[in-house]
Swiss-Prot record:
Species: Pelargonium hortorum
Identification of the protein by name: Photosystem I P700 chlorophyll a apoprotein A1
One GO BP annotation of this record: photosynthesis
Lineage of origin: Eukaryota, Viridiplantae, Streptophyta, Embryophyta, Tracheophyta
Catalytic activity: reduced [plastocyanin] + hnu + oxidized [2Fe-2S]-[ferredoxin] = oxidized [plastocyanin] + reduced [2Fe-2S]-[ferredoxin]
Listed EC numbers: 1.97.1.12
Binding site for chlorophyll a': H675
Length: 750
């Protein structure tokens, strides 16, 4: 029997003044590395400086010191985020038409940027309505501000200043927790305490405070705004907070205070904590009362979750015990050993977090249109398209990052001597089966999905529409997807007896929400065209996964290079004299994976953009007749590759190509410039190092002749550097091209 002292033990978890603050050291480029600190001999030095500045593993092998650097860097990151937010709010306060938009969001477009007339570029200030001229923004900030109850530009100023104060505070915290009071390694590895604090503090109290803000500030202010009250007449947020009678006039049960909460008489709160489902017909957004209810429920769940883990007192879950008890029938000793991996390798931990956060970000992308959370968001088509595209790209990059850090973990932190027969070892031992099967799946999906399109193009070209796969000829209906849609559409009143409408209008039914003559959302029909493109999605996702997973599973060794772990995370080839060993490093798999990620997400956002313009977005007449932007052409046009090129890319590029001389002309310039950036990448991807070194030496000779040669020797980019520059410009150029194409189109027609 274990006798525990009733007093919790006090652990000393910080070191005082571990590292002195030295501006002299910070001013010395490369101070973190003995080699780089010597200064440049060749131009490769500047590349190494950038490559290693944040690679804390390369500065020291002391896990505590690495942990402190990462922790401190997080505060720096938060500081930048607050600075960015402050800038957004400041633009809203200083350069925007927010107050005008608030008074008439259906006829006035959001703008928070006015171009100064320096060389005639004031043409970019288009008329967004209400007599305001500026650049139309598509970030969704106006909708968020309205939902949170901001009614004046003064409030935006105050928030911007508050964010600046927080940015300064975060910078200070980053310095303080590295130089003055740095946590010990034990603190970083105390997972139970971390879970309790993050669950109860960040998620629990965070959700609770947001729910409180929504109930006490957002709901009353939005109720007045929806009723058409002038924003200047509405009481200020602090008046609602300090004066309960004001709220009780809107929601009578407020006079009872918190009594119903603690006496479990919750139905008293039903007027401001609802369970309606569907969208508010006035704003086209989710009911704010539903959102407040959701955040209160989430807060309570997370507050409970934040008390589940064992810390100083002898009760609660212990993560190591949970993991080691987790055994399946086929997994041998189960999760034994995983705890040690995740508390000693931050790359392994980061990999999991990136995979989950990336997946979550993609889930957010899909919810932003199917359950639009903010007022007047659903009818702002430019913002809807931007939010979807943005979250898809971000989520995909995070998922590729997960593979990158999993591979770095395998190379740098994995210890095969202690990892015998645990789950990871078992996966590694049958990696050939995993990769070869996944490869087969990719080949199957590729030939079949592409084959369906090729069939349709051929039949269409030969004038045989009756032999095509389409909703009007040979149907390939997505029956499983339609079944799921139907199940959700029928849920209210049956499996979800408390809800009045379904979670999303997209599931089906007869409901349609339109705001100011524009469609906010309606049931989205799925047919043969969606079936075809979904299999392209499956194909591109599986190929991306194949490349990334192969990189992780073969990061340490392969039949081709058994000693790969000794070569490190990134290397060009396995030395001279071994042909056919280039592009095998874990880094190269990330590099190649990025291109397929780009393929995958491009198809997704093209599908979304066209589908919404064809089947959802549009105007509605007095008689209730809906006219879609592209007139429902998705179902018949997107079933051939020619249709994608002709009726999507070419037809919808007309706005960006013809934008010169209009307020959208900046998008035309970006469209052109981003194509150039993309093409520039090919120069790095298609040419070798030797070619450039030869050219450089000839140019250096000319400089020597003229006695203007630099002391630092010019060097061609290494193979890996060239690829890094190439993929960066490829992605940057491709994404910026798509951005210009989408926005010029949707701002012109939406």
């Amino acid at each position: 029997m274990i006798i525990r002292s009733s007093e919790p033990e006090v652990k000393i978890l910080v070191d005082r003044d571990p590292i002195k603050t030295s501006f002299e050291e910070w001013a010395r480029p490369g101070h973190f590395s003995r080699t780089i600190a010597k200064g440049p001999d060749t131009t490769t030095w500047i590349w190494n400086l950038h490559a290693d500045a944040h690679d804390f593993d390369s500065h020291t092998s002391d896990l505590e010191e690495i942990s402190r650097k990462v922790f401190s860097a997080h505060f720096g990151q938060l500081s930048i985020i607050f600075l960015w937010l402050s800038g957004m709010y400041f633009h809203g306060a200083r350069f925007s038409n927010y107050e005008a938009w608030l008074s008439d969001p259906t006829h006035i477009g959001p703008s928070a940027q006015v171009v100064w007339p320096i060389v005639g570029q004031e043409i970019l200030n288009g008329d967004v309505g209400g007599g305001f001229r500026g650049i139309q923004i598509t970030s969704g900030f106006f909708q968020i501000w309205r939902a949170s109850g901001i009614t004046s530009e003064l409030q935006l100023y105050c928030t911007a200043i508050g964010a600046l104060v927080f940015a300064a505070l975060m910078l200070f915290a980053g310095w303080f927790h590295y130089h003055k009071a740095a946590p010990k390694l034990a603190w970083f590895q105390d997972v139970e305490s971390m879970l309790n604090h993050h669950l109860a503090g960040l998620l629990g109290l965070g959700s609770l405070s947001w729910a409180g803000h929504q109930v006490h500030v957002s709901l009353p202010i939005n109720q007045f705004l929806n009723a058409g009250v002038d924003p200047k007449e509405i009481p200020l947020p602090h008046e609602f907070i300090l004066n309960r009678d004001l709220l009780a006039q809107l929601y009578p049960s407020f006079s009872e205070g918190a009594t119903p909460l603690f006496t479990l008489n919750w139905s008293k709160y039903a007027e401001f904590l609802t369970f309606r489902g569907g969208l508010d017909p006035v704003t086209g957004g989710l009911w704010l009362t539903d959102i407040a209810h959701h955040h209160l429920a989430i807060a309570i769940l997370f507050l409970i979750a934040g008390h589940m883990y064992r810390t100083n007192w002898g009760i609660g879950h212990d993560l190591k015990e949970i993991l080691e008890a987790h055994k399946g029938p086929f997994t041998g000793q189960g999760h034994k050993g995983l705890y040690e991996i995740l508390t000693t390798s931050w790359h392994a931990q980061l990999s999991l977090n990136l995979a989950m956060l990336g997946s979550l970000t993609i889930v957010v992308a899909h919810h932003m249109y199917s359950m639009p959370p903010y007022p007047y968001l659903a009818t702002d088509y430019g913002t809807q398209l931007s939010l979807f595209t943005h979250h898809m790209w971000i989520g995909a990059f995070l998922i590729v990052g997960a593979a990158a850090h999993a591979a770095i973990f395998m190379v740098r932190d994995y210890d095969p001597t202690t990892r015998y027969n645990d789950l990871l070892d078992r996966v590694l031992r049958h990696r050939d089966a995993i990769i070869s099967h996944l490869n087969w799946v990719c080949i199957f999906l590729g030939f079949h999905s592409f084959g369906l399109y090729i069939h349709n193009d051929t039949m269409s070209a030969l004038g045989r529409p009756q032999d095509m796969f389409s909703d009007t000829a040979i149907q390939l209906q997505p029956v499983f997807a339609q079944w799921i849609q139907n199940t959700h559409a029928l849920a209210p009143g049956s499996t979800a007896p408390g809800a009045t409408t379904g979670t999303s209008l997209t599931w089906g039914g007869v409901d349609l929400v339109a705001v100011g003559g524009k469609v906010a959302l309606l049931p989205i029909p799925l047919g043969t065209a969606d079936f075809l493109v979904h299999h392209i999605h499956a194909f591109t996702i599986h190929v991306t996964l194949l490349i990334l997973l192969k990189g992780v599973l073969f990061a340490r060794s392969s039949r081709l290079i058994p000693d790969k772990a000794n070569l490190g995370f990134r290397f060009p080839c396995d030395g001279p004299g071994r042909g056919g060993t280039c592009q095998v490093s874990a880094w190269d798999h990330v590099f190649l994976g990025l291109f397929w990620m780009y393929n995958a997400i491009s198809v997704v956002i093209f599908h979304f953009s066209w589908k919404m313009q064809s089947d959802v977005w549009g105007s509605i007449s007095e008689q209730g007749v809906v006219t879609h932007i592209t007139g429902g052409n998705f179902a018949q046009s997107s079933i051939t590759i020619n249709g994608w090129l002709r009726d999507f890319l070419w037809a919808q590029a007309s706005q960006v190509i013809q934008s010169y001389g209009s307020s959208l002309s900046a998008y035309g310039l970006f469209f052109l410039g981003a194509h150039f950036v993309w093409a520039f990448s090919l120069m790095f991807l298609f040419s070798g190092r030797g070619y450039w070194q030869e050219l450089i030496e000839s140019i250096v000779w000319a400089h020597n002749k003229l006695k203007v040669a630099p002391a630092t020797q010019p060097r061609a980019l290494s193979i890996v550097q060239g690829r890094a520059v190439g993929v960066t410009h490829y992605l940057l150029g491709g994404i910026a091209t798509t951005w210009a194409f989408f926005l010029a189109r949707i701002i012109a027609v939406g």
